[in-house]
Amino acid sequence: MIVLGIDTSTTQSSIALGTERELLGEIAVAGRSHEVAVASTLRQLLSWTGIELGRVGGIAIGVGPGLFTGLRVGVETGKTLAQVLTVPVVGVSSLDALAHSVRATRKLIAAAIDARRGELFFAVYRPVPGGVVRETEPAVGPPDHLVGELEALGREVLAVGNGAILYRRELQELGGKVELAAPAHAHPRASAMVELALPRIVREEHDRLFDLVPVYLRKSDAEIAWDQRARGASD
């Protein structure tokens, strides 16, 4: 079965095609609007691999947490394609995908995505044979919240993601217990989405199309501004 993976949770979007046996192709694009990047990158990937869209048997979508506009574009694109192609869809956590990409370590894994406003989206994972499992649930907060969680766990840690790179000085407060993953792992990859979604699609444990929504973990700037105006009007 060919599965199409889509991730638009950060400033770098990626599209991938893969099967149970191999990755057929992947393209990552940074610095362009997600609306333009997803459509053009998908066309480019299909042309490059010589695969017709109609051969896709399932879709893996990065559902966040991540950037609001990017997540909305990726999730809606994936859902639309799944509806048109009449294929199953699976939502994959962007943090799960980050941790999955460095699963070969024996250390705990701290996956961290830049949430802007001086905050991170983060979760901590433990490597197990064939993958990772969560030690903590996804959360949003300033870097010291993640540092506090890691201090409490008291283990050596591999920190991965653009959030870990951005706040590496704060993470270094833990001394020699924290190693920073290579910049190549700074963003969730669509290929990891495919790997994580494939077993669920094969077992028919896919998501209900209309129940699949982005995981934001906090309100958007527009929602915060609206709340502030509403409170001001009521005072």
Show which residues each predicted segment covers.
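Surface "functional belts" at beta-alpha junctions
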Residues: 22, 30-33, 88-188, 202, ...
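Active-site phosphate/pyrophosphate- and oxyanion-stabilizing loops and adjacent acidic/basic residues
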Residues: 43, 79, 97
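Stable alpha-helical structural segments in soluble proteins, enriched in small hydrophobic residues
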Residues: 45-49, 84, 102, 193-201, ...
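Phosphate-handling active-site elements
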Residues: 47-54, 82-92
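DPxDG-like acidic metal-binding loop motif
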Residues: 60-89
